[in-house]
């Protein structure tokens, strides 16, 4: 029997999700996925991607089968991320680190900060499993911090993933990064929308694309709390704030990075980076089928200093 969709074009070569989903293997590993799988009119196994319960069950199965993450769940109403795209971000920035390290750096000596870790803890879980990296995940929502901490511990990664509560709205690095703490990389999936109404419209658009009728009060089909989905000024404002605040931590992080969903937000972000004196700026394109997104990465170290970052002497005070 055929499985869902064609090959997912555009994914990173190391991405485990190049091929169509193997629903037989996924259901064998995670039987709770089985009720959501059906054969469509083309004779292809698939599921209803507009159904939050189906998407959540698929995520649990993918994480268990491909990454050995046996325990994964979410509090009701929290963001349920698409696994192939999230892990693609990690592979792209791993290659970026490899440019100065000489090879893709692995192991607990590579410290990564995930800004807005969310209740799903997805980047730390995937990064710890794929590359052995050590993570700090920050979030302004206490429920997310508690849930992410539980996920790390329940998968035997409690010593590798630490979640910290950001106590001050508006601060991104301050209050999270300690004075002498160093990170090879920061990650962020910033709030996309400028308001709840805009987030709801985005869900209606997704449902139309999936051939579904939008309800009078649309359910956010991938879930999401306020801090996960929207902020004042949307993605552009959050990105501008992150760029400005990163300057104060220029010597403590090799590469800062963020997903940028809206291409039109790039020019202003690049101008902001130029103003604060970023030495290196990169845009890493990502594609999954027809969906195009990108990672904006910047560093206050030049190429020579970036190579020096990985020398043992550079980590004496880490």
Swiss-Prot record:
Q: Does the keyword Metal-binding apply?
A: no
Query: Which domain of life does the protein's organism represent?
Result: Bacteria
List the subcellular locations. Answer: Cytoplasm
Q: Does the keyword Membrane apply?
A: no
Name the UniProt key words of this record, in alphabetical order.
Cytoplasm, Methyltransferase, rRNA processing, S-adenosyl-L-methionine, Transferase
What Enzyme Commission number does this protein have?
2.1.1.181
Major location, coarse class? cytoplasm
| Entry-linked Gene3D superfamilies | Vaccinia Virus protein VP39
Instruction: Quote the catalytic activity from the record.
Output: adenosine(1618) in 23S rRNA + S-adenosyl-L-methionine = N(6)-methyladenosine(1618) in 23S rRNA + S-adenosyl-L-homocysteine + H(+)
What Pfam families does this protein's entry cite? Methyltransf_10
Could you tell me the Gene Ontology terms of the biological process aspect for this record?
Answer: rRNA base methylation
EC main group: transferase
Homology family: Belongs to the methyltransferase superfamily. METTL16/RlmF family.
Q: What does this protein do?
A: Specifically methylates the adenine in position 1618 of 23S rRNA.
Q: What is this protein called?
A: Ribosomal RNA large subunit methyltransferase F
